[in-house]
């Protein structure tokens, strides 16, 4: 069994071990993807993130 989550009405994550939420929708995995040092596709992911401007270096500085 793996930890799963679904979003409630307020948009908050609700963690569960079940595969379906109370509304019958499938839950999402709460675990991140595995890391591999032999990642063959990292260059492509970075290119896509640059293209759509979602890299952390392309975000505005947070206001402190």
From Swiss-Prot:
<dbReference type="GO" id="GO:0031118">
    <property type="term" value="P:rRNA pseudouridine synthesis"/>
</dbReference>
<keyword id="KW-0225">Disease variant</keyword>
<dbReference type="GO" id="GO:0007004">
    <property type="term" value="P:telomere maintenance via telomerase"/>
</dbReference>
<dbReference type="GO" id="GO:0005697">
    <property type="term" value="C:telomerase holoenzyme complex"/>
</dbReference>
<keyword id="KW-1011">Dyskeratosis congenita</keyword>
<protein>
    <recommendedName>
        <fullName>H/ACA ribonucleoprotein complex subunit 3</fullName>
    </recommendedName>
</protein>
<dbReference type="GO" id="GO:0001522">
    <property type="term" value="P:pseudouridine synthesis"/>
</dbReference>
<dbReference type="InterPro" id="IPR036756">
    <property type="entry name" value="H/ACA_rnp_Nop10_sf"/>
</dbReference>
<keyword id="KW-0898">Cataract</keyword>
<dbReference type="GO" id="GO:0090671">
    <property type="term" value="P:telomerase RNA localization to Cajal body"/>
</dbReference>
<dbReference type="InterPro" id="IPR007264">
    <property type="entry name" value="H/ACA_rnp_Nop10"/>
</dbReference>
<dbReference type="GO" id="GO:0031429">
    <property type="term" value="C:box H/ACA snoRNP complex"/>
</dbReference>
<dbReference type="GO" id="GO:0005654">
    <property type="term" value="C:nucleoplasm"/>
</dbReference>
<comment type="similarity">
    <text>Belongs to the NOP10 family.</text>
</comment>
<keyword id="KW-0209">Deafness</keyword>
<keyword id="KW-0687">Ribonucleoprotein</keyword>
<dbReference type="GO" id="GO:0003723">
    <property type="term" value="F:RNA binding"/>
</dbReference>
<dbReference type="Pfam" id="PF04135">
    <property type="entry name" value="Nop10p"/>
</dbReference>
<keyword id="KW-0698">rRNA processing</keyword>
<dbReference type="GO" id="GO:0005732">
    <property type="term" value="C:sno(s)RNA-containing ribonucleoprotein complex"/>
</dbReference>
<dbReference type="GO" id="GO:0090661">
    <property type="term" value="C:box H/ACA telomerase RNP complex"/>
</dbReference>
<dbReference type="GO" id="GO:0070034">
    <property type="term" value="F:telomerase RNA binding"/>
</dbReference>
<comment type="subunit">
    <text>Part of the H/ACA small nucleolar ribonucleoprotein (H/ACA snoRNP) complex, which contains NHP2/NOLA2, GAR1/NOLA1, NOP10/NOLA3, and DKC1/NOLA4, which is presumed to be the catalytic subunit. The complex contains a stable core formed by binding of one or two NOP10-DKC1 heterodimers to NHP2; GAR1 subsequently binds to this core via DKC1. The complex binds a box H/ACA small nucleolar RNA (snoRNA), which may target the specific site of modification within the RNA substrate. During assembly, the complex contains NAF1 instead of GAR1/NOLA1.</text>
</comment>
<keyword id="KW-0539">Nucleus</keyword>
<dbReference type="GO" id="GO:0031120">
    <property type="term" value="P:snRNA pseudouridine synthesis"/>
</dbReference>
<dbReference type="GO" id="GO:0072589">
    <property type="term" value="C:box H/ACA scaRNP complex"/>
</dbReference>
<dbReference type="GO" id="GO:0016604">
    <property type="term" value="C:nuclear body"/>
</dbReference>
<comment type="function">
    <text>Required for ribosome biogenesis and telomere maintenance. Part of the H/ACA small nucleolar ribonucleoprotein (H/ACA snoRNP) complex, which catalyzes pseudouridylation of rRNA. This involves the isomerization of uridine such that the ribose is subsequently attached to C5, instead of the normal N1. Each rRNA can contain up to 100 pseudouridine ('psi') residues, which may serve to stabilize the conformation of rRNAs. May also be required for correct processing or intranuclear trafficking of TERC, the RNA component of the telomerase reverse transcriptase (TERT) holoenzyme.</text>
</comment>
<dbReference type="GO" id="GO:0034513">
    <property type="term" value="F:box H/ACA snoRNA binding"/>
</dbReference>
<keyword id="KW-0690">Ribosome biogenesis</keyword>
């Amino acid at each position: 069994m793996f930890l799963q989550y679904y979003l409630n009405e307020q948009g908050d994550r609700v963690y569960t071990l079940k595969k379906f939420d109370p509304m019958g929708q499938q839950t999402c995995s709460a675990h991140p993807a595995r890391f591999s040092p032999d990642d063959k596709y990292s260059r492509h992911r970075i290119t896509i993130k640059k293209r759509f401007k979602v890299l952390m270096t392309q975000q505005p500085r947070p206001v402190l």
